[in-house]
Amino acid sequence: MQIIEGKLQLQGNERVAILTSRFNHIITDRLKEGAMDCFKRHGGDEDLLDIVLVPGAYELPLILDKLLESGKYDGVCVLGAIIRGGTPHFDYVSAEATKGIASAMLKYSMPVSFGVLTTDNIEQAIERAGSKAGNKGFEAMSTLIELLSLCQTLKG
């Protein structure tokens, strides 16, 4: 039996985008910082890292599709924060953002990591953006790095 898995180390020549929504920027800025830190710590070249900002989580799938279609990137780390409010808006935005991100990843067969928080309140979001529950932006970039490595291994 053979076990195949990715490594948590970049070769240093991977071009990566961090796609982040600006809405709830107090949270998404921290997620972005965590992702950038992870990229650098694991051998990424800052000159090969682009930060792409969109207004909100609903816009993430469209711009992810454009980034993958461009052929410029080896992978994309998608970050956002959708916080439940008093209306069904949360359900619609989180469902469509999630479906759209997964759809673009499969359409282009490219590594994409999902770091979009979906929380019931601001406290939960803060916990996941660098306090009690770690930084989910850092974790999303870690996932992307492993995916990049695994895809390279499977390519042969």
From Swiss-Prot:
This is 6,7-dimethyl-8-ribityllumazine synthase. Coiled coil: none annotated. Transmembrane segments: none annotated. GO terms for molecular function: 6,7-dimethyl-8-ribityllumazine synthase activity. Belongs to the DMRL synthase family. InterPro entries: LS (IPR034964), LS/RS (IPR002180), LS/RS_sf (IPR036467). (2S)-2-hydroxy-3-oxobutyl phosphate binds at residues 86-87, 128. The active site is at residue 89. The keyword ATP-binding does not apply. The keyword Zinc does not apply. It is an enzyme of class 2 (transferase). HAMAP family: Lumazine_synth. 5-amino-6-(D-ribitylamino)uracil binds at residues 23, 57-59, 81-83, 114. GO terms for cellular component: cytosol; riboflavin synthase complex. GO terms for biological process: riboflavin biosynthetic process. CDD domains: Lumazine_synthase-I. It catalyses: (2S)-2-hydroxy-3-oxobutyl phosphate + 5-amino-6-(D-ribitylamino)uracil = 6,7-dimethyl-8-(1-D-ribityl)lumazine + phosphate + 2 H2O + H(+). It comes from the Bacteria. Catalyzes the formation of 6,7-dimethyl-8-ribityllumazine by condensation of 5-amino-6-(D-ribitylamino)uracil with 3,4-dihydroxy-2-butanone 4-phosphate. This is the penultimate step in the biosynthesis of riboflavin. It holds the Pfam family DMRL_synthase. Pathway: Cofactor biosynthesis; riboflavin biosynthesis; riboflavin from 2-hydroxy-3-oxobutyl phosphate and 5-amino-6-(D-ribitylamino)uracil: step 1/2. Keywords: Riboflavin biosynthesis, Transferase.
